[in-house]
């Protein structure tokens, strides 16, 4: 037992003596080791003999001593930039008393000095932190909490006693540190020719050189404690704060963010260990809280697995953010101004949410470096397989469901509310077209975005920040001031907090963005190309725009932070050959950009070129299509002047990707001389159909990201296809900070939205309002008129019945597919065989179009689909392939020579003399697809085939319905074929269009042939309707869409046989052939013309207003894709009524797909084509498609 001075009298008594500045051990099992405390300068107290004051941006120097005190530098366990001392209750800017140690302040680095030119890759702070010179600390507020006594006896404290709050420093334990027995004789140095100093080691031998080197031991971070002790002004320890408060105060004290002071409110006169002491704690934000935090960029390029780790800096930011949030909630601090996001839905700041999104919410918390190889393998397997050229990315579970897509639609509508109030702007006289009012408004908005005009939008608070006020610190004895709510707060008392990253600022953080451009997301068919062309005419300035690209490029994403190859110093080997080579005399490209680069799908390249030529005064705008393997040198193209000047370069996504891959291979070579598209800066970059880059990991997206341009535009009718991260890719291309940073977008938008946080909708709405303009055809202007006045559109759904033979084939195929699905589902293997199920559904959809399509392979799923064709039903019905062969038995059509010539001559004479269209005896309508019976009576082909099948089902002899003669077999039927002169003028790739016997367009020949049963129900319906259109409008033009090019081949052969002129547009054609096809289709004609077009190649972007009839031959999973196809015709420039016909077969998979679409439970956005939602919803939808959940209603009205 040692003697102790009594706190009251100073006398000694037999008890362990509490030492000044050092903690006494308590009896609650706390750490028994002597832990040196941080040297503390008490607030409002002069009892301390000296204090330590460390400059805010420097570290303590090693070995600085004064008197008997030695300050040694030590790295904090929480953050490698922490100071060695937590200054608690100390004023950093106060005068330094005698004995104070002040470490020298280091100069700011060049990167910090210029940090206001680029936004951080980790947080959207304003410019470099601006801290007023007179700012010392700001009073945040006070709260009442409990403390637990660690002392026994009287005189330690009483109500009103001031207390000093202190924290022990955490220690780092170096496992590999030198043992105590090994002497360290100071730094290594040369003395009298000998090396002395350092830790002595053994002599180096050959064995030790060859021995395996031991990896240096890593520093083990000591367990983080949350003990906060408090003492009286005389230095006697009293107790510690409760765990609840210490949990969030400890980290803030350790990092110097806050300073604490307090006093005792109530306590027992005689303290006992563990008794409760009621305290009042005052909290101040220290000057260090507003210094630059978390701004250090990664010093190395991390691999994928390392990139998933939470770095030490990210951990420190997360702890700081969570601790500040808890502190603000404990004190009751409320923001006086929230961001624009909070204004949409009034909330009590971000503090009221249970838990905000982490800055790196998407990162894995576990370090892969400590995991086993097996765990790493599993991690890789869990990652989605991404193809560079694929359209899908990310987790399939993040696809938006129907409810979420409806929420996105509501966000669009809210973002459109102010669009009708935009001013109208006329384009220059060089633009020949007349813009509609809503297009003039778009020109106003786009021009302001490119000019960077801040007057269009008031300067507002950054969306991630909130504004707060420091409170007035009431000193004891001062009168209590009552603040007036209407009183304008003093600007020096304002501070700002980012609740997402935990950063604090004394400067107003604005939402200004250096990005020049945006997203023009008007609905399809509203003239986005025309509006962009007017902008090209309006803004053609030829002045250097400064280093805008470098200002915005750095803060978007770490993926592209590398210095462009064109700016790096290039070294060339000096050789004799290159010293004597010819000197190029071609003019160099001017130092400032002037050309616009348009990137679009290959099918739209020629259309962009033609539209620009039509809309521009001759010689005002020169455009060039840069496409194909024989592309001209881009440098020479941009260097042209006068008549050779090129203002707009049009290229395709495929060409750009090819150029990008070539540039990546060559840009780092020593002999690289430039000349790539990526070595030049453009005045403007325009992405048409910009949703093509929605996969941020695809090569085409990276190719677009890397382009250099002062202004960037994305044109798309669907900014969000099926994931919120589709929008991120556009923002990243546009260089819009901070949303173009993947970590921020995922943390603040994607994750909260998927977690059904309604505030995430406000974030998305704010983003869209700031950079997106979207109008729809149904919108009205300020006067209540529709902004787009288009002709009416009529959509007709024709529900058809299968023929008897087609029904048998389909039912057989459906039963086989359904049985396999039931077996897989019963075994629990349905989702693991998901691709096989999709292949079965593909075969069913093909069979609905035409049974012959089932015989062909369908891409990657062909082999899986082929298994369905094999026998194995076990019911004696034979092989499906045999059934289709029997159905197609009439495909070998006989020539006219195969028919009896006398019989043919007699019938042809009668047909040639007949002028009126005959009436069918079975349907009482005009005959379609005339068929001649052996008794010379005629009928519709569908009617007589159905009649013969019905008789066979009833075991009756089929006879003529007119005269009763029989029996009649299908082989006895003859078709009546009338052929008109039709040719295809595009290429020789489409044969069979000309009949040498026809000499004029009005010539018609009548022939007899065997009935061609290969024409399916849909084909016959299409031919019948085309024949009706030909009679009503001899100059009609129509589009026939199908997603199966093999079905287009059958339609092509059928049209050729019927003498109907057609053109073809699909993905197998070159860009030149596509352009020629569209040009030919747009020419005037005196006869009907049909364009056979694949849904994928021609469903988006094309302007085909020269047609007004649309036929959709099959049903797609996503109805929006079909609407896009219809909008190729129903768009600006259409002056005729549009008629749309959709063909479906009753009682088949098509009907059920439409029912799912109608009931709003569809597999949204092609989840059946290359993805899945949750397991339960996917299986439920597949069962609906197979017709397993309910009876198929044949009498349903569509």
From Swiss-Prot:
Ranges of Low complexity compositional bias? 45-58, 118-129
Q: Name one GO biological process term.
A: DNA repair
UniProt KW Signal keyword: no
Q: Where is the Helicase C-terminal domain?
A: 1021-1180
The segment annotated Disordered runs over 1-129, 348-401, 541-564
Which controlled-vocabulary keywords does the entry list? ATP-binding, Cytoplasm, DNA damage, DNA repair, DNA-binding, Helicase, Hydrolase, Metal-binding, Nucleotide-binding, Nucleus, Zinc, Zinc-finger
Query: Compositional bias (Acidic residues) spans?
Result: 386-395
Composition bias of kind Basic residues appears in 104-117
Q: Name one GO cellular component term.
A: cytoplasm
User: What Pfam families is this protein classified in?
Assistant: Helicase_C, HIRAN, SNF2-rel_dom, zf-C3HC4
Q: Which residues bind ATP?
A: 522-529
Zinc fingers classed as RING-type: ranges: 920-964
Which positions are tagged coiled coil?
A: none
The cross-references to Gene3D superfamilies, in alphabetical order and at most eight, read: P-loop containing nucleotide triphosphate hydrolases, Tandem AAA-ATPase domain, Zinc/RING finger domain, C3HC4 (zinc finger)
Please indicate which superkingdom the organism of origin belongs to: Eukaryota
The record's similarity note reads: Belongs to the SNF2/RAD54 helicase family.
Q: What does this protein do?
A: Probable helicase, member of the UBC2/RAD6 epistasis group. Functions with DNA repair protein RAD18 in error-free postreplication DNA repair. Involved in the maintenance of wild-type rates of instability of simple repetitive sequences such as poly(GT) repeats. Seems to be involved in maintaining a balance which acts in favor of error-prone non-homologous joining during DNA double-strand breaks repairs.
The protein, known as:
DNA repair protein RAD5
* Natural source organism: Cryptococcus neoformans var. neoformans serotype D (strain JEC21 / ATCC MYA-565) (Filobasidiella neoformans)
